Amino acid sequence: MAYLSNLTLYYKPTCPYCQKVLAYMEEQDIACEMKDVTIPGVVDELVAIGGKNQVPCLIIDGQPMYESDDIIMYLHGLVAAEEIG
């Protein structure tokens, strides 16, 4: 799958829910902009976009999506659409 420029994933390397999303992305060869919230200033950027500092957070065309299962379900839909199309 190609690089998805309309997506940004905010994550924390030690977060098990983030690891779940990252593992799925790697398994499906999904790439997008990645932002590590442990880097100074990145969590403030996340809060400015979504109103909270919860990770993982997938930004889709500027709109936040939280919860690892929801993010994986969304990404699965993209993979399925690519396989069909």
Regions found by a protein language model. Name each.
Residues 31-43:
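Thiol-based oxidoreductase modules, predominantly thioredoxin-like and allied folds used
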